[in-house]
Amino acid sequence: MVGLVDALGGGPAVIAGHDWGAPVAWHAALLRPDRFRAVIGLSVPYRPRGSVRPSTAMPQTADAIFYQLYFQAPGVAETELSRDVRSSIRRILFSGSGEGRRAHAGLGNPAAVGMVPRGGGFLRHTAEPATPPPWLTEADVEFYAGEFSRAGFRGGLNWYRNIDRNWELMAPYAGARVTVPALYVAGDQDLVVHFRGMDQLLPNLKKFVPELRGTIMLPGCGHWTQQERPKEVNDATLA
């Protein structure tokens, strides 16, 4: 990120990130406040370094495991997602959206809390939309499917496989706080905000991000914050 800022003129910059991009943005601001004057996290809030390896704290039961644990074994998720790349993309995008969450409300399946059934798969409790949501075009699906068909899913999944290593590398920063001005934006239907521990982290986020200027929860919005609600996200980031 520092190299990108250098290439674009030197900054200091405002950095924003969504999903895995959010920890990248939060930690860029944490580590280099001289190069990043503000930070915006979408979906994933800043989470201070815990006292145990992240993978050891992830939930699992006799029937299901947390999806990030499912992603750990090389080749397993890649094989599942690559069987039909276009269908996988449609299922993931729809099931994570506000529309998808409403369509599957009350089903009571393990996916409701980010769990993957043992002996099943990540896509088992997903479905392709009968009608795509208005923010998702077939051109979008074709582009994403083309890129994943070309490059595969391993690069993205390796982010999950590196969680414990990143935790090790951040040991010198245990207890560190993000000190630059910050904003957190998420949808109230985003599964991320319903993960275990979020009910304690989100109300106390300002303890770890003292210059947090606001937490914005978008009603009815799912995981794909900036796709589902582009105007609201743009308005919030420019305010």
Model regions and ranges:
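Catalytic histidine-centered segment of alpha/beta-hydrolase-like enzymes
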Residues: 221-230, 234
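Hydrophobic residues on the short alpha-helix immediately C-terminal to a glycine-rich phosphate/catalytic loop
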Residues: 28, 236-237
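Flexible "cap/lid" subdomain of the alpha/beta-hydrolase fold that forms the substrate-access gate
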Residues: 1-16, 20-213
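Short glycine-rich catalytic loops that host catalytic nucleophiles or stabilize transition states
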Residues: 214-221
